[in-house]
């Protein structure tokens, strides 16, 4: 507990909340261009080849974004929309690519959870 003298000398600092997605600069999504599309392996105990893309955003940041869903059409110079949201077993991946917008097409033959993968309602 500080004394009154200590509080006069320097006031209490407000707690600053740190953003989990700084590259978005407070926006819900950002547009970017893929500079590299590749796969990485998750940390223990999981095992897979997770599809990720290195994306240069309009905010100037270069980030690593996860490509959700089965199969994708992304390659270098593809324009994508990026949202926040980390992938728990991929260290350093703090963003997701939004499927069904710009150059990222929706997941083929998706029946359930379609809105998360940019798929229209089947006729």
Swiss-Prot record:
Subcellular location: Plastid, Chloroplast
GO MF term (any one): rRNA binding
Record keywords: Chloroplast, Plastid, Ribonucleoprotein, Ribosomal protein, RNA-binding, rRNA-binding
Any single Pfam family the record assigns to this protein: Ribosom_S12_S23
GO BP term (any one): translation
Xref: InterPro entries: NA-bd_OB-fold, Ribosomal_uS12, Ribosomal_uS12_bac
One of the record's GO cellular component terms: small ribosomal subunit
UniProt keyword annotation of Plastid present: yes
Domain of life the protein comes from: Eukaryota
Gene3D superfamilies: Nucleic acid-binding proteins (2.40.50.140)
Role summary: With S4 and S5 plays an important role in translational accuracy. Located at the interface of the 30S and 50S subunits.
PANTHER family, per the entry: 30S RIBOSOMAL PROTEIN S12 FAMILY MEMBER
Assembly: Part of the 30S ribosomal subunit.
Family: Belongs to the universal ribosomal protein uS12 family.
Protein's name according to its UniProt entry: Small ribosomal subunit protein uS12cz/uS12cy
Taxonomic classification: Eukaryota, Viridiplantae, Streptophyta, Embryophyta, Tracheophyta
Name of the encoding gene: rps12-A
């Amino acid at each position: 507990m500080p004394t009154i003298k200590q509080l006069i000398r320097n006031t209490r600092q407000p707690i600053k909340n740190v953003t989990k997605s700084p590259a978005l600069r407070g926006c819900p999504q950002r547009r970017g261009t893929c500079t590299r599309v590749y796969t990485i392996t998750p940390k223990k105990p999981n095992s897979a080849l997770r599809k990720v893309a290195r994306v240069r955003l309009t905010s100037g940041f270069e980030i690593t974004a996860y490509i959700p869903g089965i199969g994708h059409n992304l390659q270098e110079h593809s324009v994508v929309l990026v949202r926040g949201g980390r992938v728990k077993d991929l260290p350093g991946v703090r963003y997701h690519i939004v499927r069904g917008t710009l150059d990222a097409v929706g997941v083929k033959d998706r029946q359930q959870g379609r809105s998360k993968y940019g798929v229209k309602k089947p006729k």
